[in-house]
Amino acid sequence: MKCLPENLDRNHDFQKSPRFSETGIALILVLWVVTILAVAVLSFSLTTRSEARAMLAYKEGMENKFLAEAGLRRAILELFYRKTNPQQQVLREGFEIFQCDGRPYTGELGDGRYRIRIEDESGKINLNGLTDANGVVLKNLLMNRGVADDEANVIVDSILDWRDRDNIHRLSGAEDDYYQSLPRPYRAKNADFETLDELFRVRGLTAEILLGTGGQKGILPCLTIYSKSDKINLNTAPPEVLKAIPGISGEIVERILQYRDLKPDEKVQLISGWLGPDLNVIAAYVTDAESNVYSIDAIGYKGNEKRRYAIRAVVMVEGAQKYRFLSHKSPSLSES
């Protein structure tokens, strides 16, 4: 059996040797550096991927926006074509006159698409032309949407009070005394509506009534502040508005809508053969004259329509090649 040298300490701790300590520290440092580099590379990779996705989304959004703008300009050109061809004669196939009753039209631009709807504002209920006499149309519209009779009276009277110049409220209306009693008080405008958003401040009107809920449409698309008439255009009014006009039955509404589809280049005339025995009643609320103010909803999309871009504009056509925007929302919440 060999003996250990006397100069060798049996209790010597190899882990405390300088050489071993330096090697261990170096190994730990290397591991830390590798870990930090791995985290940095992963973070850079994730950041780069996120930025790439953001750039692609931005690119797609801009392309969709330009497609929607193209649709808007196409709609304006169609309005010019309509104005320069008042008899609405179809010159040849593919050059049909665009109708202004909200029906959709589509177009392609490269690998993208746009869809547009044009509505003549004279086919809607004009809030700035509302009176105690014709307010019944708005009341009927509300009741057809499920609003109770007394609640509909409150809304119609409150809209009239919001516009009139005095501070005396109607039987079911509201003036300053009501609005000043609210938790956040304000005053009745006592002037014409400048935007439809003002309706949210009028007594009785809620988001559910204006915008709809649970599959039930709201009344906002049936209202306007831009029409020059206090009457409703039979040729462009949506079905919901037609059904709200006193004297017009469901049968007459269907007849009008069918005529529009079968003969889009002709107008529904204010004659008894069309409107039945209640012509005199109906005539107090309707017209067959087209206005020069139109709302346009345009959407653009490539591939996935869910990522579409929407624009809503109200345009006044002032001549053969002249127009101006009365309203322009980009993007909008359009459902075109």
Which residues does each PLM region occupy?
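Compositionally biased linear targeting/interaction segments
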Residues: 3, 25-336
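Exposed boundary/loop context
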Residues: 2-3, 17
